[in-house]
C-alpha cells in the first residue's frame, strides 16, 4: 500500500512541523516578555 505509506508519512511530517513551529514561536528566549498569547 504505497498510498497508505505516503499518507502516513505526510501526516507525521505535518504534526512534527506543527510541534516544532509551536515550540519555537512559544520559546521565551526568542520572544522575551511576551509570554503565552492563549
Swiss-Prot record:
Keyword Plastid among UniProt keywords: yes
One BP annotation, GO: photosynthesis
Alphabetical UniProt keywords: Chloroplast, Membrane, Photosynthesis, Photosystem II, Plastid, Reaction center, Thylakoid, Transmembrane, Transmembrane helix
InterPro entries: PSII_PsbI, PSII_PsbI_sf
Membrane protein topology class: Single-pass membrane protein
Localisation per UniProt entry: Plastid, Chloroplast thylakoid membrane
Membrane-spanning parts: 4-24
GO CC list: chloroplast thylakoid membrane; photosystem II reaction center
Pfam families referenced in this protein's UniProt entry, alphabetically: PsbI
Highest taxon of the lineage: Eukaryota
Protein's job: One of the components of the core complex of photosystem II (PSII), required for its stability and/or assembly. PSII is a light-driven water:plastoquinone oxidoreductase that uses light energy to abstract electrons from H(2)O, generating O(2) and a proton gradient subsequently used for ATP formation. It consists of a core antenna complex that captures photons, and an electron transfer chain that converts photonic excitation into a charge separation.
PANTHER family: PHOTOSYSTEM II REACTION CENTER PROTEIN I
Family statement drawn from the similarity comment of this UniProt entry: Belongs to the PsbI family.
Subunit structure: PSII is composed of 1 copy each of membrane proteins PsbA, PsbB, PsbC, PsbD, PsbE, PsbF, PsbH, PsbI, PsbJ, PsbK, PsbL, PsbM, PsbT, PsbX, PsbY, PsbZ, Psb30/Ycf12, at least 3 peripheral proteins of the oxygen-evolving complex and a large number of cofactors. It forms dimeric complexes.
Protein name: Photosystem II reaction center protein I
Gene: psbI
